[in-house]
A protein has these predicted regions:
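Short, solvent-exposed loop/linker segments at the N-terminal edge
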Residues: 272-278
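Beta-sheet-rich non-transmembrane sensory/scaffold domains
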Residues: 1-252
Length: 278
């Protein structure tokens, strides 16, 4: 949660993420309707860094440590939520966005049945450890978004491929598309991640690839002249549109732990998605 801790530190912190989805899409499974949300979060003017908050000493006895800039101090949080007893200090810390995507059962009152938790961030930590939580308009921006909504899950769509329902989630700041099997909503799992961004390029010069995926459209195989299912991704910052052909769906769950070495990058990503136009 800090851009000043000199490394990747994914863990449990005493904060509450407000989902505030930027995109949502509904689909059917098991006779119910489910809603998939990309939990980006978005502040206006009601936020400050936690280092400037007055924290309740009973709830946060270690406030002095938590509010260090290498801990939670740099993280932006809501200034209008969290003073539960209205005594002028904060009993809870509410941050914008959840850095995740969620699935809600709309046939049963909108109950939450799945949330990806920290997995989207952990995937990036393994796939792009030297560009973790980068901004979308500048390369060489390692961890510049750690204190402010992280990768920012922005876009989401779903599609059926060979009898399986697949969710495609786009990360606006980091870039990249996540594939999840959501056929059984409560037991959804990661399939793959691909990022067409070039971290060695120059964003302003237009040589950094796709930047800022803003929207994703799924085109079923029977509606595509090529006979293959594809997704179309609109990238806000680079102004590019890219088509990805779904080459193959893996059977295995490709969950990954947080890693910080180049040698731990995920493999076989391009087997499942293939870029064929921009």
């Amino acid at each position: 949660p800090s851009d000043r801790d000199s490394g990747i530190n994914i863990g449990n912190w005493p904060v509450l993420g407000m989902h505030m989805p930027d995109s949502a899409v509904a689909y059917g499974a098991n006779g119910n309707t489910y809603l998939v949300t990309a939990n980006e979060g978005d502040a206006r003017s009601e936020d400050e860094r936690i280092e400037d908050f007055v924290l309740d000493p009973t709830v946060f006895p270690n406030a002095a440590d938590l509010q260090q800039r290498s801990q939670l101090g740099r993280l932006g949080a809501s200034t209008i939520d969290g003073d539960i007893d209205s005594d002028g200090d904060f009993d809870e810390l509410h941050v914008y966005g959840a850095r995740s995507f969620s699935i809600w059962d709309m046939s049963n009152g909108g109950v939450l049945v799945y949330d990806s938790g920290s997995e989207l961030e952990r995937v990036v930590a393994g796939y792009d450890p030297f560009d973790f939580n980068s901004n979308n308009d500048e390369n060489d921006s390692f961890e510049s978004r750690s204190d402010n909504k992280g990768i920012e899950p922005e876009a989401v769509t779903v599609g059926e491929i060979n009898g399986r329902t697949i969710a495609f989630v786009g990360a606006e700041r980091q870039g990249g598309i996540y594939l999840y099997d959501v056929t059984d909503p409560a037991n959804s799992y990661l399939l793959s991640y691909i990022n067409n961004r070039d971290f060695s390029g120059n964003a302003e010069a237009g040589t950094a690839g796709d930047l800022g995926p803003e929207g994703i459209v799924f085109v079923p195989a029977d509606q595509n002249p090529t006979g293959s299912a594809i997704i179309l991704v609109a990238n806000e910052v680079s102004g590019s549109t890219t088509a990805y052909r779904i080459v193959e769906l893996p059977d295995q769950d490709l969950r990954t732990e947080s890693k910080e070495a180049e040698s731990t990058k995920l493999t076989a990503i391009s087997v499942y998605l293939e870029s064929y136009g921009a």
